[in-house]
Amino acid sequence: MKKIAIIGAGVIGSAVAYELAQRGWRTCNIDKLPAAGYGSTSNSCAIVRFSYSTYQGVAMSYEGMHYWTDWENYLGGPEIDESGLIEFRQTGTALIKAPDGHHQKVTPLLEELSIPHEHWDLNRLSERLPILDHGVLGPPSRPEDESFWADSTDDIEGALFTPESGYVSDPQLSSHNLQRAAEAC
């Protein structure tokens, strides 16, 4: 049997351990903290979004969403972890169409990968997220600068909504789920 040491026991280290364990490797995660998912990046799996600026980032995040939506089957069943399994809550996310134009980089990638998305104007954004302030604030300034207190004079353009995105109910538990699944292999 092949053996490997994995540095880190967060969601990435635990996922690597699980994937390798399924392939017959004996894994050992090394982490300075007391349990899986306790590190500074434990929440890095919390929000599942597709608004990255590279093809690879968007493609990987969209593929990853499919693991979250089928988490129980991916891990081998509900009994894999005595603490229970996380839930993926598919709420969708809204990327604000801000002056920096990030949405213009993301839109062609979503289209190329056939990822469902919607362009919301300010009316639609107000219907869906009525509490959201549409004002553009910035550029950044210090509190002692007079412009720091100025009201916004411009509005955002709207939002780019991706209905299949969402969040993981308990990021720390997701690492624990992966740890238990790796141990069960």
Q: What residues fall within each predicted segment?
A:
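Dinucleotide-binding Rossmann-like beta1-alpha1 core, especially the glycine-rich loop
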Residues: C45-E146
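Short, flexible, mixed-charge acidic loops at enzyme active sites
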Residues: G39-C45, W149-T153
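Gly/Ala-rich phosphate-binding loop of Rossmann-like dinucleotide-binding domains
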Residues: A17, A21, A181
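Helical element adjacent to the flavin cofactor pocket in flavoenzyme catalytic cores
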Residues: S147-C185
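Glycine-rich FAD pyrophosphate-binding loop
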Residues: A21-T41
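Beta1/beta-strand and adjacent pyrophosphate-binding region of the FAD-binding site
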Residues: M1-I12, C28
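Conserved dinucleotide-binding and phosphotransfer motif residues
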Residues: R23, L113, A184-C185
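Short beta-to-alpha linker loops that shape the active-site pocket of alpha/beta-hydrolase fold enzymes
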Residues: L33-A35, L125, L178
